Amino acid sequence: MASSLLLALLFLTPTTVVNPKTEGPCPACWGAIFDLESQRELLLDLAKKSILDKLHLSQRPILSRPVSRGALKTALQRLRGPRRETLLEHDQRQEEYEIISFADTDLSSINQTRLEFHFSGRMASGMEVRQTRFMFFVQFPHNATQTMNIRVLVLRPYDTNLTLTSQYVVQVNASGWYQLLLGPEAQAACSQGHLTLELVPESQVAHSSLILGWFSHRPFVAAQVRVEGKHRVRRRGIDCQGASRMCCRQEFFVDFREIGWNDWIIQPEGYAMNFCTGQCPLHVAGMPGISASFHTAVLNLLKANAAAGTTGRGSCCVPTSRRPLSLLYYDRDSNIVKTDIPDMVVEACGCS
């Protein structure tokens, strides 16, 4: 197991680059010795660093505006639906986020209600807002109808007053949840980190007859954000079993409650980080575990024989396939973010 920790440090840390042609044996073959508890602590520290790095966070978020359990449960239920088919090819992936921002009330009266939505500054770092949905709850008298204008207000550069950029008309005829798909003006505002919506009924109504619900019915905006991904090639490998010393995948589970992160990570409760460990003889160099063909094995064996006695280089057991970690969490602004963090779960290992 001494090699497993070194491999995890070498191949799961994003900033580390390993060159198989480096002189000397593979670092996995070095004789460093760690007790089991030290290995576990270092692997947990590595998992925390990897998650924070890939979420572009310097430290875990401290929740400044906690969201009530009722509002969180309701928002997730409203957004939950059938799984959408991807439009991407199998060898192309894109990093996607869904960010949920709950409303703060800036102005409320009989005639209008103004809602403020705050998004993290990371939205402006090259991310594309693909869709913005506004969801709100209305309590309305029975057998009544009301027309409501929903205005998108933005603060333009070098201006101190909000400017009306677009307006939507919604017919309200019953109590319940209403959903409105917002246009490019709202998407641009979300990208800049702040969105203001103003709700104005067309006719005068009593204050008690039109109420935007709070607590479990708190209004929110859900923004879908996308970042271009990289090409992936999936390769198969083998899992570690028994006393085998060949290159394989060792399972390792990270429990978010154990590391004290269950307050800001909503789902899942943990994830299987996994890592690669084991030996790689020269004749299996470049093979994905033992799944390569017999012809490839023979060619590599010939190359190994030709190199015998002329080199001290070794082959390393490295990840050959990874998959993303689906995460639902609170960001610095207490917004709820749903995303897939790429390359977090090692699925297969092979020899470099």
Curated annotation (Swiss-Prot):
Gene Ontology CC, one term: extracellular region
Subcellular location: Secreted
Signal peptide (residue range): 1-18
Summary of the tissues where the protein is detected: Mainly expressed in the adult liver.
GO molecular function: growth factor activity; hormone activity
Disulphide-bonded residues: C240-C248, C247-C317, C276-C349, C280-C351
Alphabetized UniProt keyword annotations: Cleavage on pair of basic residues, Disulfide bond, Glycoprotein, Growth factor, Hormone, Secreted, Signal
Presence of keyword Thylakoid: no
Superkingdom classification of source: Eukaryota
Keyword match Glycoprotein: yes
Pfam families: TGF_beta (PF00019)
Glycosylation-annotated residues: N111, N143, N161, N173
Function: Inhibins and activins inhibit and activate, respectively, the secretion of follitropin by the pituitary gland. Inhibins/activins are involved in regulating a number of diverse functions such as hypothalamic and pituitary hormone secretion, gonadal hormone secretion, germ cell development and maturation, erythroid differentiation, insulin secretion, nerve cell survival, embryonic axial development or bone growth, depending on their subunit composition. Inhibins appear to oppose the functions of activins.
Quaternary structure note: Homodimeric or heterodimeric through association with alpha and beta subunits, linked by one or more disulfide bonds. Inhibins are heterodimers of one alpha and one beta subunit. Activins are homo- or heterodimers of beta subunits only.
Name of the protein in its database record: Inhibin beta C chain
Organism of origin: Mus musculus (Mouse)
